[in-house]
UniProtKB/Swiss-Prot annotation:
<dbReference type="Pfam" id="PF00297">
    <property type="entry name" value="Ribosomal_L3"/>
</dbReference>
<dbReference type="InterPro" id="IPR000597">
    <property type="entry name" value="Ribosomal_uL3"/>
</dbReference>
<keyword id="KW-0488">Methylation</keyword>
<feature type="region of interest" description="Disordered">
    <location>
        <begin position="132"/>
        <end position="155"/>
    </location>
</feature>
<dbReference type="InterPro" id="IPR019927">
    <property type="entry name" value="Ribosomal_uL3_bac/org-type"/>
</dbReference>
<keyword id="KW-0687">Ribonucleoprotein</keyword>
<dbReference type="InterPro" id="IPR009000">
    <property type="entry name" value="Transl_B-barrel_sf"/>
</dbReference>
<comment type="similarity">
    <text>Belongs to the universal ribosomal protein uL3 family.</text>
</comment>
<feature type="modified residue" description="N5-methylglutamine">
    <location>
        <position position="153"/>
    </location>
</feature>
<keyword id="KW-0689">Ribosomal protein</keyword>
<protein>
    <recommendedName>
        <fullName>Large ribosomal subunit protein uL3</fullName>
    </recommendedName>
</protein>
<dbReference type="GO" id="GO:0019843">
    <property type="term" value="F:rRNA binding"/>
</dbReference>
<comment type="subunit">
    <text>Part of the 50S ribosomal subunit. Forms a cluster with proteins L14 and L19.</text>
</comment>
<dbReference type="GO" id="GO:0022625">
    <property type="term" value="C:cytosolic large ribosomal subunit"/>
</dbReference>
<dbReference type="GO" id="GO:0003735">
    <property type="term" value="F:structural constituent of ribosome"/>
</dbReference>
<keyword id="KW-0694">RNA-binding</keyword>
<dbReference type="InterPro" id="IPR019926">
    <property type="entry name" value="Ribosomal_uL3_CS"/>
</dbReference>
Amino acid sequence: MSLGLVGRKVGMTRVFAEDGQSIPVTVLDMSANRVTQIKTADTDGYNAVQVAYGSKKANRVLKAEAGHFAKAGVEAGRGLKEFTADAAKLAELKVGDTLTVELFQVGQLVDVTGTSQGKGFSGVIKRHNFSSNRASHGNSVTTRAPGSIGQAQDPGRVFPGKRMAGQYGNVKRTVQSLEVVRIDAERQLLLIKGSVPGSKGNDVVVLPAVKAGA
């Protein structure tokens, strides 16, 4: 993992390229990423930067958290996130600094991680893209049933990992190699080509793409 930012999904819109092409983009608000701690291999066993993101009411902050934020001299955040970084990058940062969208460049590929939208309890057709059974000719109650889920007496159980009905969505997902279309440094906005996981207002983590050179 390399240095990145934590932000919130604002929503989707579109922008027009110079040739008139309409490009669908997701707007991400990446403001208020404040460095709260710098970890080094000598003191912590690894190199990393801890950042606080978002904001939180003072009466909602635990005493331990309040002390940590006060020691760093930053406003209390909604949460903390660590990004690993090399020693050279750590030397450029200090506690209390603010990370901005200038970490990225237009045209750069990034990986975006978020929590996908929850769809509730869903059947196997919606959840796992199973095919439905026949809707007539003697089939009355098993049109959307999963079918056999295992053998009989031997082994007499359902194998772990069997695809069945259950909670659909609301899981951590990463979309890789999305292009940064525009950067609004004044409002700390990133416009990413395509869609990213989650609903409006959800937290997302943006990192340089792992497979950018592939």
